[in-house]
Amino acid sequence: MSAKWQFTLVGLLAVLAGTALLLANRPPEAPAQVAPDVSPAVVMAAGFRDLQGGRRSLGEFQGKVVVLNFWATWCAPCREEMPAFERLQAKWKARGVQFVGVSAEEGPKVLEFAKRFGVTYPLWVGGDEVPELSRRLGNRQGVLPHTVVFDRQQAPIVERVGAYPEDSMDSLLAKLAAISIEK
């Protein structure tokens, strides 16, 4: 190999290594403010099934902060964040916070998952419309998990694609709980 080609190859490798280093050290994506393609009333009225087959909607949590998490049993980041959501549900439930997980999978599979992993907050099944609702709430990539936080007036205020860090969610819920105390 000639010296010219060696120099070019070393330069190219340096550029690739620098790019990889920059991408690896990039801070995690912050939750985005939601600009949904759907009205809050439509989201609150959307029908889901609980694990016993009953009809449910987010509208039943009127006056509460709702953390809506789109997930699947096969999704590794979903499984990783669920224990944190379980802890946060226990911590903030008395302050009017309600976590709800929604999956497009079949009820028996979700029920088995809930029992196996000890998930006690509501897990609902939404069927084929779940991916479209998630997209309309800001999930342009169509990936899981996708979390949307609604304020007490049922307006979506924050959404995040990917696992939601426990400390970030805890800070957000503390702010939302403080707002409700002041009112």
Predicted feature residues:
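Active-site acidic short loop of glycosyltransferases
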Residues: 61-64, 94, 120
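Thiol/disulfide oxidoreductase modules built on the thioredoxin-like
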Residues: 115-119, 126-175
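Aromatic-flanked redox-active Cys/Sec active sites in thiol-based oxidoreductases
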Residues: 69-74, 104
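C-type cytochrome heme c attachment motif
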Residues: 73-80, 143-146
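Structural microenvironment flanking redox-active thiols in thiol-disulfide oxidoreductases
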Residues: 79-118, 128-135
